[in-house]
Design a protein with these regions (language model features):
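Terminal membrane/secretory targeting segments in land-plant proteins
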Residues: 1-33
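Catalytic domains of carbohydrate-active enzymes, especially glycoside hydrolases
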Residues: 45-67
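Substrate-binding cleft of extracellular glycoside hydrolase catalytic domains
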Residues: 68-175
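Active-site mouth loops of central-metabolism enzymes
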Residues: 28-42, 91-92, 172-173
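Noncatalytic carbohydrate-binding groove/subsite architecture in carbohydrate-active enzymes
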Residues: 130-230
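Short, acidic/polar
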Residues: 37-51, 95-108, 177-180
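Conserved, mostly hydrophobic/aromatic
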Residues: 59, 118, 193
């Protein structure tokens, strides 16, 4: 029990801070990315119980984890489940592999687990060898979900640095040959593009245009000079 206490305390602190953020204007719900790499971590069930006790309505897992998925059954927590980068090639190359992945990691737990999105790859850079597998893997996973009778959206998670220029409303994707076909797929299927946004890093890299209150989530709103909208 003593080995789990520091990690459990850290999770409780994070949960408490995020719960406080729910009081910010315009915030309807909030989720927490659940990383499983580390020492002396609480059990999966303890982590899910913490989410529920702090009214955290969303979770992201960076790869399938049987214990975590089992603990999520009946929790009503919406889940974003990632497909790791090292699995993209096999899933992109073989529709049967995609179908088996969906069977093992999604259909087995649905509808007891509320899958919101399957994120095919996380922060895959356009220059990486894995980049050419992202879209075909997304297509195969989408087809496997449809064949399994599951209405779950498929997307991928990108770095905010994939967009160049400031403000974001005036930005452009820096590798249109990579992202444009993905955007077309997402638009055709009514899926969002997922982006990993780190406000404090944005502030650190561009303090002239980005305010500290924005980075600390204490700003009542941030207006884009391009759109005059928050």
């Amino acid at each position: 029990m003593s080995l789990k206490q520091p990690a459990m305390s850290s999770l409780f602190l994070v949960g408490s801070l995020l719960l406080a953020m729910l009081q910010l204007p315009g915030v309807q719900s909030i989720g927490v990315c659940y990383g499983l790499l580390g020492d002396n971590l609480p059990s999966r069930q303890d982590a899910v119980n913490l989410y529920k006790s702090r009214n955290l309505g969303g979770m992201r897992l960076y790869s399938p984890d049987r214990e975590a998925l089992q603990a999520l059954r009946g929790s009503n927590i919406e889940l974003i489940l990632d497909i790791p980068k090292d699995q993209l090639e096999s899933i992109a190359s073989n529709a049967g592999t995609a179908s088996q992945w969906v069977q093992d990691n999604v259909k087995t737990y649905s509808p007891d687990v509320r899958f919101k999105y399957i994120a095919v790859g996380n922060e895959v850079e356009p220059e990486e060898a894995a980049a050419r597998f992202v879209l075909p893997a997304m297509q195969n996973i989408h087809n496997a979900l449809v064949s399994a009778g599951l209405q779950i959206k498929v997307s991928t998670a990108v770095k905010s640095s994939l967009v160049t220029g400031y403000p974001p409303a005036n930005g452009q994707f820096r590798s249109s040959s990579y992202i444009d076909p993905i955007i077309n797929f997402l638009a055709a299927n009514g899926s969002p593009l997922l982006a990993n946004i780190y406000p404090y890093i944005s502030y650190f890299e561009n303090p002239r245009d980005i305010s500290l209150p924005y980075a600390l989530f204490t700003s009542p709103g941030t207006l884009s000079p391009m759109t005059s909208a928050a």
